Amino acid sequence: MEDAWEADALEAAEAAAAAAQAVAADAPTTTPSPRTLQRQRACEALMEGDAPDAAPDAPLRCAIAWDGVNCWPETPAGALAVQPCFDELNGIRYDIRQNATRMCYSNGTWRNYSDYVHCRELVEAESDEDAAMAFVFFVGFCLSLVAIAVAIWIFLYFKDLRCLRNTIHTNLMATYICNDATWIISAVVQEYVENGGLCSVLAVLMHYFYLTNFFWMFVEGLYLFLLVVATFTGEKVKLQIYIIIGWGIPGVIVVTWAIIKHLGKTAPDNAGESHPMVLLIKHCPWMAEDYFDWIHQAPVITVLAVNLVFLFSIMWVLITKLQSANTAETQQYRKATKALLVLFPLLGITYILMMQGPMDGVAGHVFRNAQALLLSLQGFTVALFYCFLNTEVQNTLRHRMSRWRETRTVGGGRRYTLSGHSKDWSPRSRTESIRCLQHRS
């Protein structure tokens, strides 16, 4: 009975310690930190001075031992050795208030591994600035969600607004909804729930929707480039091609990244601190940055670089056209500046401006807060410029309100539906997305 109990206890202890023992197993394959080497040298000095007791009636004991992570003291046979957790390992700080254990068998030998299951990484307290930035991101994403949801409803409800250009806008706005919503869900869930499986799913979804956002920005840039710069219209490129670019390619990239990251089993590095989009995510190794992340980071950088080329090309055509027009120079500059500012959020140029900046002092504080504000309100800005301030949208809404008031004045003699209407009054400028480009010949 006692043997059965001992076997069950041993099996349970081995199962509980299996995951934690990976720390000790990895130690020989990584370069030990100076603190770990210091502990090892101190332990080796103790082992050299630990002379074995040659007395025949001396009780069995386990000698001082170094397991690659911690130093275990001399322990009587059949006893469980208890040691405070190491304070540091491979540059990561651990909670020394918790304990690690190692069994000394009745024959005076150590168990092959130690139990570090209770040794947890110390989580630094969130600074006031980090909390403020997280709040800005949260509020900005919520505002963007509301604005984009209204904009998408307008584009889908009113048939007069259904065209390839607005369909592209709608898909871009949909990526903002998915991206912002996933970030909010991740922030809330990871704040209160520690679940490795859920963390992995949220990480993959966040990276996918983050990528789709940039690829639909690329689609916007490609469409405008074909419309304004190229010799043929962007309407000749079918919507299906844009959908494959915007939704399909990011899926292939993220699946590839997820498989390689899972197989690589890399350790967390900086806990994703450099990525503003995961500011609130905690205890989630999948959010940690490593060299595998270049699989999805390189396409983002490429998209932004290509969109920058698109922007220069479009602005060159616009400025050339304005210079040939009979308008005052001040008015030309005003129109060019307006077009440039409108294109910034659509093509993701804001991300380029916020990619690098000062990190220390007052300048760093201002930059980080500006980064949080601009990036979280990116979706709101797109909805504002390309829906709420769009001439075509305003005319559509104004026309519907006018018709609705007329029917109420008449007394509602016939039922009028907002979606049943004529399309002959609505402007159909191919370059309505940039109103100052309307008169391109």
From Swiss-Prot:
Pfam families associated with the record: 7tm_2, HRM
Alphabetical UniProt keywords: Cell membrane, G-protein coupled receptor, Glycoprotein, Membrane, Receptor, Signal, Transducer, Transmembrane, Transmembrane helix
Mode of membrane association: Multi-pass membrane protein
GO molecular-function terms, A-Z: diuretic hormone receptor activity; G protein-coupled peptide receptor activity; peptide hormone binding
Function: Receptor for the insect diurectic hormone. The activity of this receptor is mediated by G proteins which activate adenylyl cyclase.
Protein family (similarity comment): Belongs to the G-protein coupled receptor 2 family.
Listed GO biological process terms: adenylate cyclase-modulating G protein-coupled receptor signaling pathway; cell surface receptor signaling pathway
InterPro entries: GPCR_2 (IPR050332), GPCR_2-like_7TM (IPR017981), GPCR_2_diuretic_rcpt (IPR002001), GPCR_2_extracell_dom_sf (IPR036445), GPCR_2_extracellular_dom (IPR001879), GPCR_2_secretin-like (IPR000832), GPCR_2_secretin-like_CS (IPR017983)
Tissue: Expressed in Malpighian tubules.
Cytoplasmic side: 159-166, 225-238, 316-338, 392-441
CDD domains: 7tmB1_DH_R
Extracellular-facing ranges: 188-194, 261-291, 358-371
Protein name, entry field: Diuretic hormone receptor
Residues linked to a glycan: 99, 107, 112
Keyword Ribonucleoprotein recorded: no
Positions of transmembrane segments: 135-158, 167-187, 195-224, 239-260, 292-315, 339-357, 372-391
